């Protein structure tokens, strides 16, 4: 039976849906960024010709993260070979060569920024035989050389179900392997037409089976038309496929050509899903709030690694 931790006064918010989903509620407003500190991070990234998912995907937390000197690096170019209708990253299906200098430049950025924890992600590169696995491997290797104390989190695509490519990624020995499931099963064809719900779950399970000591992570969005029961079932599926950490955030439509927001989920509802995941299912951590994104405050994983050493 699900434990309920919310006061009666908060219960009414659990199923509240905005009548005008185009109008953001108060809790989705972000603080004005500190432009000087943002400029320092942006300048460094520009000098080293590096992309970030913060910029390419129009993340609402870019001000906070850049101001604190952190960023999620986006490797293998700023354009994706898929055109998911929720995503703001550019689309390009053409075959493109990888830049062999990218791993070195990324490692230099990590060193200059003195990062204790780095998140490396990529666009989908379905034009590559290994989906970009070898580039992930090289990036981890170069970061380890220049910053051996830095913990590394990889946020990878599904690699088209190429399990040999997945093993190559895992052979680089990241501290955290993240692959986002993004939405509930019933919405997959609509939200991720080139993805596959079960393939994502299989990737997460195979990750833990091949590399048991890695911390596994996945995330998804609310507000695309899912029901609360579907969210609970999704959390159960992730737990049954050996996921340690989950992130849950509000979907925000990038523009009129993208999927519209179906509802704005209130903060108490996010808390409800967090407590269900941690207390009922036993996840190591569920980070759940309207502005949560998969790499938001990712550096806090180091606290979990100390609490749950492997």
Swiss-Prot record:
Keyword terms, alphabetized: 4Fe-4S, Cytoplasm, Iron, Iron-sulfur, Metal-binding, S-adenosyl-L-methionine, Transferase
Compartment(s) of residence: Cytoplasm
Catalytic activity entry: [[Fe-S] cluster scaffold protein carrying a second [4Fe-4S](2+) cluster] + N(6)-octanoyl-L-lysyl-[protein] + 2 oxidized [2Fe-2S]-[ferredoxin] + 2 S-adenosyl-L-methionine + 4 H(+) = [[Fe-S] cluster scaffold protein] + N(6)-[(R)-dihydrolipoyl]-L-lysyl-[protein] + 4 Fe(3+) + 2 hydrogen sulfide + 2 5'-deoxyadenosine + 2 L-methionine + 2 reduced [2Fe-2S]-[ferredoxin]
InterPro entries: Aldolase_TIM, Elp3/MiaA/NifB-like_rSAM, Lipoyl_synth, rSAM
EC number: 2.8.1.8
Binding site for [4Fe-4S] cluster 1: 54, 59, 65, 295
Cofactor(s) in the UniProt record: [4Fe-4S] cluster
Note on how the cofactor is bound: Binds 2 [4Fe-4S] clusters per subunit. One cluster is coordinated with 3 cysteines and an exchangeable S-adenosyl-L-methionine.
Pfam families for this protein: Radical_SAM
Ligand binding ([4Fe-4S] cluster 2): 80, 84, 87
Domain of life of the source: Bacteria
Molecular function GO terms recorded: 4 iron, 4 sulfur cluster binding; lipoate synthase activity; metal ion binding
Radical SAM core domain ranges (all copies): 66-284
PANTHER family xrefs: LIPOYL SYNTHASE, LIPOYL SYNTHASE, MITOCHONDRIAL
Name the UniProt record assigns to this protein: Lipoyl synthase
Organism: Prochlorococcus marinus (strain MIT 9215)
Gene: lipA
């Amino acid at each position: 039976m699900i434990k309920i931790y919310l006061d009666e006064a908060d219960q009414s918010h659990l199923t509240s849906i905005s009548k005008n989903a185009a109008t953001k509620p108060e809790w989705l407003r972000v603080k004005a960024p500190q432009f000087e500190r943002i400029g320092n991070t942006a300048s460094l990234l520009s000098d080293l010709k590096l992309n970030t998912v913060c910029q390419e995907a129009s993340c609402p937390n870019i001000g906070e993260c850049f101001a604190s000197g952190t960023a999620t690096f986006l490797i293998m170019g700023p354009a994706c070979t898929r055109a998911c209708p929720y995503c703001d990253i550019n689309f390009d299906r053409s075959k493109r060569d990888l830049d062999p200098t990218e791993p070195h430049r990324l490692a230099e950025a990590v060193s200059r920024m003195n990062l204790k924890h780095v998140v490396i992600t990529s666009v989908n590169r379905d034009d590559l035989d290994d989906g970009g696995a070898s580039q992930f491997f090289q990036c981890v290797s170069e970061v380890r050389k220049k910053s051996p104390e830095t913990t590394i989190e990889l946020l990878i695509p599904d690699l088209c179900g190429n399990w040999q490519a997945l093993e190559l990624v895992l052979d680089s020995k990241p501290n955290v392997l993240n692959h986002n499931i993004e939405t509930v099963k019933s919405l997959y064809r609509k939200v991720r037409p080139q993805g596959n719900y079960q393939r994502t779950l299989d990737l997460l399970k195979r990750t833990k089976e091949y590399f048991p000591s890695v911390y596994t992570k996945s995330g998804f969005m609310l507000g695309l038309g899912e029901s609360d029961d579907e969210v609970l079932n999704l959390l159960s599926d992730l737990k049954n496929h050996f996921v340690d950490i989950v992130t849950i955030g509000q979907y925000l439509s990038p523009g009129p050509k993208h999927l519209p927001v179906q509802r704005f989920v209130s903060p108490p509802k996010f808390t409800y899903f967090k407590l269900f995941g941690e207390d009922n299912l036993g996840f190591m951590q569920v980070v759940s709030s309207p502005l949560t994104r998969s790499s938001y405050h990712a550096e806090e994983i180091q606290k979990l690694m100390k609490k749950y050493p492997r």
